[in-house]
Each structure stands twice: as C-alpha cells, then as structure tokens.
C-alpha cells in the first residue's frame, strides 16, 4: 500500500508541474477596467446616449431602474402598430364615404366636387 500512495503522490505532483509549465491550468482573467458594455449595463442606455457622467445621474444606476414601456405590453390597444393604423385608415375611409353619400361634404368649400373635376376635363 505505501508503494501505491507514493505512486499516486508522484503522479499528482507530475500533473501539477505539467499544467503549470504548459499553461494548461485555469487562466486568471485579467480585469482591464470599464468597457462600453459594462458601463451601458450599469448606467442604462439613457445615460450613454446623452453622455451624462456618474454625478449627473440621479437615483440608482442600472437596468433594474427602467420601467417597461406601456406600448410594448401585449394586449395594449393604444400602441401604434401597423395593424391599428390600417384599421384606423379603413374606418376613416368608410366615414368619408358615408359623409359623401349623405351630402355633408358638398357644403365644404375646400374639397373639390366631382362636378368641378368633370368641368375641368371638358375645358
């Protein structure tokens, strides 16, 4: 048994010596100071975009401070999406057609009528 423990001890010492000389051990990560990413994470995008310093920022720094925007919430009907704009455009067009059929647009002087467009084509 003593021969086995000596062999085990010798193999462990050899492995430690080889890993230290060949650089196979765990490399120590160097800390090189602030980077743009770390500053952006700690200060948030509003601080980097306006180039404010640490002293100008009031309150705690970090992304935890930022509130989620109401527009990004799923199920919100007030958000300006292309779908909402299309629906609004269709509703406005249908309202325009309804007013045109009712004759309400004939009293407005700023809109050209269909008769005046025909008169312009004839002359």
Curated annotation (Swiss-Prot):
Residues 20-30 form a propeptide. GO terms for molecular function: galanin receptor activity; galanin receptor binding; neuropeptide hormone activity; type 1 galanin receptor binding; type 2 galanin receptor binding; type 3 galanin receptor binding. Residues 53-79 are annotated as: Disordered. The modification Phosphoserine is found at residue 116. It is found in: Secreted. The keyword Thylakoid does not apply. Belongs to the galanin family. Endocrine hormone of the central and peripheral nervous systems that binds and activates the G protein-coupled receptors GALR1, GALR2, and GALR3. This small neuropeptide may regulate diverse physiologic functions including contraction of smooth muscle of the gastrointestinal and genitourinary tract, growth hormone and insulin release and adrenal secretion. This is Galanin peptides. It comes from Bos taurus (Bovine). The lineage of its organism: Eukaryota, Metazoa, Chordata, Craniata, Vertebrata. The gene is GAL.
């Amino acid at each position: 048994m003593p021969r086995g423990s000596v062999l085990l001890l010798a193999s462990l010492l050899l492995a430690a010596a080889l890993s230290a000389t060949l650089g196979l051990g765990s490399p120590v990560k160097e800390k090189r100071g602030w980077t743009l990413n770390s500053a952006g994470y700690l200060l948030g995008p509003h601080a980097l975009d306006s180039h404010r310093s640490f002293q100008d920022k009031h309150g705690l720094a970090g992304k935890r401070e930022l509130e989620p925007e109401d527009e990004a919430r799923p199920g919100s009907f007030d958000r300006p999406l292309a779908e909402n704009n299309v629906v609004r455009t269709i509703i406005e067009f249908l309202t325009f057609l309804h007013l045109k059929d009712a004759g309400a647009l004939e009293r407005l002087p700023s809109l050209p009528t269909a008769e005046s467009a025909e008169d312009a084509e004839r002359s």
